[in-house]
Swiss-Prot record:
Presence of the UniProt keyword Metal-binding in the record: no
Function, in words: Required for the formation of a threonylcarbamoyl group on adenosine at position 37 (t(6)A37) in tRNAs that read codons beginning with adenine. Is involved in the transfer of the threonylcarbamoyl moiety of threonylcarbamoyl-AMP (TC-AMP) to the N6 group of A37, together with TsaD and TsaE; this reaction does not require ATP in vitro. TsaB seems to play an indirect role in the t(6)A biosynthesis pathway, possibly in regulating the core enzymatic function of TsaD.
Subcellular location: Cytoplasm
Domain of life, source organism: Bacteria
GO biological process: tRNA threonylcarbamoyladenosine modification
Pfam family, one: TsaD
Keyword tRNA processing: yes
InterPro entries: ATPase_NBD (IPR043129), Gcp-like_dom (IPR000905), T6A_TsaB (IPR022496)
Species whose genome carries this gene: Thermotoga maritima (strain ATCC 43589 / DSM 3109 / JCM 10099 / NBRC 100826 / MSB8)
The protein's name: tRNA threonylcarbamoyladenosine biosynthesis protein TsaB
Binding partners and assembly: Homodimer. Forms a hexamer composed of two TsaB, TsaD and TsaE trimers.
């Protein structure tokens, strides 16, 4: 099976399986996603003598995360698969972060959304992944309350490390379970609210 999977919600993570061989790339340089991602993907495919049409499924991170980075990842995947209508596996970036954690237990994943607010989700990782709190935007105060409520064993915050191997494995699973989508159905998981909305909700809570 040939699988390409990538996530650009924060840093660039790319995984590629060609048959039984797995290849992983993590880019932490200063170049913008739009500059580096298409180049790296093309180089990886060329070095492995793989054509895009040879791919069985392509996975892409849909967030939560920086919208600009997510759009670059999604646009890159759409450009690759649209001529061949290759199935796309939509990957929740917070779920991929939790699955990349080597330890089991309650996992809290959080990332700064804007000043005073975080994206946040909580999962139970134990021979699988079960959401205890779906991704949402919360204030810094709410994040403290959520941390107290769930008493997570693991807290993954801001610099989120996603394993390219996990991206590939999840893409394969979605392909096997027939949970892939068409390229024109890809949408980023956009959770941001306006500052006015967030401040109004905060005011209502007192």
């Amino acid at each position: 099976m040939n699988v390409l999977a990538l996530d650009t919600s924060q840093r660039i993570r790319i995984g590629l399986r060609k048959g039984e061989d797995l290849f992983e790339i993590s880019y932490t340089g200063e170049k913008k996603h739009a500059e580096i991602l298409p180049v790296v993907v093309k180089k990886l495919l060329d070095e492995l003598d793989l054509k895009v049409k040879d791919l069985d499924v392509v996975g892409v991170g849909i967030g939560p995360g920086g919208l600009t980075g997510l759009r670059v990842g999604i646009a890159t995947v759409v450009g690759l698969v649209s001529p061949y209508d290759i199935p796309v596996a939509p990957l929740n970036s917070f779920e991929m972060t939790a699955k990349s954690c080597p330890a089991d237990g309650v996992v809290l994943v959080a990332r700064r959304a804007r000043k005073g607010y975080h994206y946040c989700a909580v999962y139970l990782k134990d021979k699988g992944l079960n959401p205890l709190k779906e991704p949402s935007v919360v204030s810094d105060e709410e994040l403290e309350e959520i941390t107290k409520e769930f008493s997570p064993k693991i807290v993954l915050k801001d610099d989120l490390l996603i394993s390219p191997a996990v991206l590939v494995e999840e893409s394969e699973r979605l392909f096997r379970e027939k949970k892939t989508i068409h390229y024109y159905e890809i949408e980023p998981l956009y959770l941001q609210k306006s500052i006015a909305e967030l401040n109004w909700e905060k005011k209502k809570r007192g």
